[in-house]
A protein has these predicted regions:
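Leucine-rich repeat domain C-terminal region
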Residues: 194, 199, 270, 274-394
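LRR N-terminal entry segment and analogous cap-like coil->beta motifs
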Residues: 66-115, 119-123
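Conserved hydrophobic beta-strand positions in leucine-rich repeat
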Residues: 72, 92-94, 116-118, 139-144, ...
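Terminal targeting and flexible regions in eukaryotic proteins, enriched
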Residues: 1-71, 75-76, 88, 98, ...
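Leucine-rich repeat
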Residues: 80, 100, 124-126, 150, ...
Length: 412
């Protein structure tokens, strides 16, 4: 019993010896990481900029948040000139000012710039110093929408991934305009003055990484030629396109979303949209008289405000394959000339349908199908989601198709 009573004391002595052994040990020396390369902002990840050990330099006209020292905010300040940009700045925000020129001087030391936002200013092409952007070898994102550009602002650095030029006055794209931009994934040219002649030299053909192309609110009468097979999102709303060649999309197998509302489409070849990855198809506000084949991948179909009198389900779904079902969940068909609802055969062909929006029809002002909105097997959560989706799309199609937000919402 005497020996047992001394055991706790022996344990304490052993612990003390172990502690003394490591008392002077520097754990930081053991786990110090080797010198790291400077952290660069990646627009596709959440940045975690290391804290600066000293006060960061910032232009007096701007604000540099201590928590994000690599960003400089100069927006909404009625600036007429671009201030000098410190070397450490990676994100520069100059939108919503009165800037008319982009001289090279302020960018002399800005070698680490990754993103520049110059949208909503008064910049003209001839007021941009030649090569001012091309010298920024780390630049990946450039916003120049809502300015007064008459021409494409080349040359640009090969590092560029996102180029936003919507709402300018650009009317021409020469064949070499986009040369040297192999990394471009998003190109926005909505709300410009482009017509078919601007695409004669096939300016998009060599953009092998292009995934999103926005050409809405222009003057196109035909489909743009030779688009790259990498394309996933194509926006052509508010043009004057009247025809889609039968095999046009055969070279665009990765298309996820296609928006062609507010055009002059009348007849569409039956299998035009037989695409393996298509999720959203918007053909509202055209002159269509009949439907077409629906690919199995499609989830949302918008064909409102057309001249469709009858929806032939057998055209949309010529055969049923129990092991390979269609994924269509939402159809919008209001403002057509329907007098009867879609055949119940549609629910065998499209077993995932949750909502069909009939709304008012154009037979006469008072024509309205008995059920304005058909909803099938909806849980309360699904009901709220369907309602929200419909309200959101209403706003997009009726209010925002000519506004600033012409970008696809992310699917994933």
């Amino acid at each position: 019993m005497g020996i047992l009573s001394q055991l706790p004391i022996m344990h304490l002595l052993c612990a003390a010896m172990v502690f003394c052994q490591y008392e002077d040990y520097d754990f930081e020396d053991e786990y110090d990481e080797p010198n790291q390369h400077a952290y660069y902002f990646n627009p596709n990840t959440q940045p975690q900029v290391p804290p600066f050990p000293f006060p960061v330099e910032c232009a007096k006209e701007c604000f540099c948040p201590p928590a994000f020292p690599s960003s400089m905010y100069c927006d909404h300040r009625k600036l007429k000139t671009i201030p000098n940009i410190p070397n450490h700045v990676q994100q520069l925000y100059l939108q919503n000012n009165d800037i008319e020129a982009v001289p090279a001087g302020p960018f002399t030391n800005a070698t680490f710039l990754r993103e520049i936002n110059l949208s909503h200013n008064k910049i003209k092409f001839h007021m941009i110093d030649s090569g001012v952007f091309a010298k920024l070898l780390n630049l990946v994102q450039l916003h120049l929408q809502f300015n007064e550009l008459e021409q494409f602002p080349f040359p640009l650095p090969s590092s560029l991934e996102r180029l936003l030029l919507g709402s300018n006055k650009i009317s021409q794209l020469s064949g070499n305009t986009l040369e040297g931009l192999p990394n471009i994934t998003t190109l926005d040219l909505c709300n410009n003055s482009l017509d078919d002649s601007a695409l004669k030299e096939k300016p998009f053909a060599n953009l092998r990484n292009l995934m999103q192309l926005n050409l809405c609110n222009n003057k196109f009468q035909t489909m743009p030629p030779d688009l790259p097979s990498s394309l996933m999102h194509l926006s052509l709303e508010n043009n004057s396109i009247s025809y889609i060649p039968e095999n046009y999309f055969s070279r665009l197998p990765k298309i996820i979303a296609l928006r062609m509302s507010h055009n002059n489409l009348q007849n569409i070849p039956r299998y035009t949209f037989n695409l393996p990855n298509l999720l959203e198809l918007n053909l509202g506000h055209n002159k269509l008289k009949q439907v077409f084949y629906i690919p199995r991948s499609l989830q949302h179909l918008y064909i409102e405000d057309n001249d469709i009198e009858f929806i032939n389900v057998t055209l949309m779904c010529p055969s049923m394959q129990p092991m390979n079902v269609n994924h269509l969940t939402y159809i919008r068909v209001d403002q057509n000339k329907l007098t009867v609802p879609i055949s119940t055969y549609a629910f065998f062909c499209f077993p995932h349908i949750r909502t069909i929006y009939y709304g008012e029809q154009k037979v006469n002002k008072s024509t309205r199908l008995r059920t304005a909105v058909f909803r099938r097997y909806l849980t309360p959560e699904e009901f709220e989601e369907a309602e929200a989706n419909h309200e959101t799309h209403d706003q997009e199609t009726e209010e925002d198709h000519g506004a600033e937000d012409n970008y696809f919402h992310p699917y994933f």
